Amino acid sequence: MRSVTEDFIPCNREEIETRLERKMDGNMRTGRERQQRNLGIDLLRIFCMFLICILHVCGQGRAMVRYAGREEVWYSVYILETAAYCAVNTYGMISGYVGVRSVRRPSRIVELWLRVFWYSALGTLIAVTFFHLPVESDTLYQALFPTMWKTYWYFSSYVGVFVVEPYLNRLVKSLGSTGKKKLMITLFLLCSVFTMVPRVANRDFLGIGAGYSFLWLSVMYIIGACVRELTDQNGPERQKQECSEPGGAETSITETENTAGVKEQKEQDSEKNVDFLHRSGGLYGMLYIICVLVTWVSKILIENWTTSVYGEARYGRLLFSYASPTIVICAFCLLMIFSRLKCRGRVLRELIQFFSPLAFSVYLMQLQPYFWEYVLAGRYQFIAKLGPAAACLMVLVMAAALYLECTAVDLVRMAAFRLLRIRRVAQVITDFALRPFAELTEQENREASGEV
């Protein structure tokens, strides 16, 4: 083990200053993050899972059955599904937004896998034993090997993202503000805009899988991480801190004698950075609504036109996909809106802290194979027979009820996990599995906390 003095043997004065700046900045930042959790992001998790419930009510629940002569009901409910379609992308961006500045805890993925296995295996056992539902080989494989069989496609893809997360973080942190923006724009154009037309023709030349893939979640992770880094570097509080500290992030101590012209240029660049990601929440809200309407209207117009020309609806999913540019922009807008929310009030904060850890289980419960096929399928078809306004209201009510239903079930799982001390079990499994990589993991944690 190295001594304390060995860590601070300087090569020159600049190295001392750089190390001290980095150490002080990292300590202040991590201290603030430990004390002030961003409840806006936790609220966004809850909201996104509610949107996913809307998708499942409309889709598998068949609330969007299109009856002849009742197209107005289908159109009205479809706008709700369009507004909710960005939820998965937003979840991916949240992972990057939080993960780029969080201390990595490998046992977390083991805990999540045990939660997934709880719902897949135990749910199958209950369905077969108590409800005498049929067992097929494929269903059994899905229950016992939920990750490899993609029982829950999002979790299967997220496992890959979790493995490469440290390297994605290093990529983002190695870039300057301009580089991060260029990376975000490049990924958006390459993976979303340029794949739009080939996707309509069922051509997936980048292997994005219409957003159902590890590659796509990695792209969303990087965008979320870039947003976090840019907002932390260029936020109003950060700017004030840099202006009050000699030799801040824009100028080191040894560079204070630079020309006034260079300083003015940096100030102008800083103002541009602030303008880019610190617009008002109302602007992002308007942009979200515009993108939802564009996606919704385009689907209706394209399908009606192709029906009149070809006799059947075609190309309606031009903008209706996880990888669609408008859907990605919607997800980005939600992230920007909720990340700056100030959740005041003790009751509101307690509700957010209660529901947020349970949000992911709402997804697991709904995607459980037997629940998906025998409980959720066609459950809400009666909604399609209501009027337009009543149908929209009922979709929202049923989605909220489904969310609370799954949350109540997960409380049982949470109590069982505490009784079985699953967190401790996950930590033991992780320590044993990662013993050869312990030094690398410690290095990654130091980098994430700003100590290196």
Say what each PLM segment does.
Residues L125, E303-L419, E439:
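Alpha-helical transmembrane segments of multi-pass integral membrane proteins
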Residues T5-T30, Q233-H278, R446-S449:
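Intrinsically disordered, low-complexity terminal tails and inter-domain linkers enriched
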Residues C48, W74-S95, G99-V128, H132-V161, ...:
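Transmembrane alpha-helical segments and their boundary/interface "anchor" motifs
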Residues V163-L189, V227-E242, G261-L287:
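Solvent-exposed interhelical
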Residues F50-V57, Y119-V128, L187-V200, Y288-N304, ...:
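Aromatic-anchored segments of alpha-helical transmembrane domains
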Residues R413-A448:
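Membrane-proximal cytoplasmic C-terminal regulatory module of class A 7TM GPCRs
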Residues Y75-V88, Q142-S157, R199-M220, W296-C333, ...:
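Interfacial loop-to-helix transition and helix-capping segments at the boundaries
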Residues A63, T129-S137, M196-D204, S298-G311, ...:
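Juxtamembrane "helix-exit" motif on the non-cytosolic side of transmembrane helices
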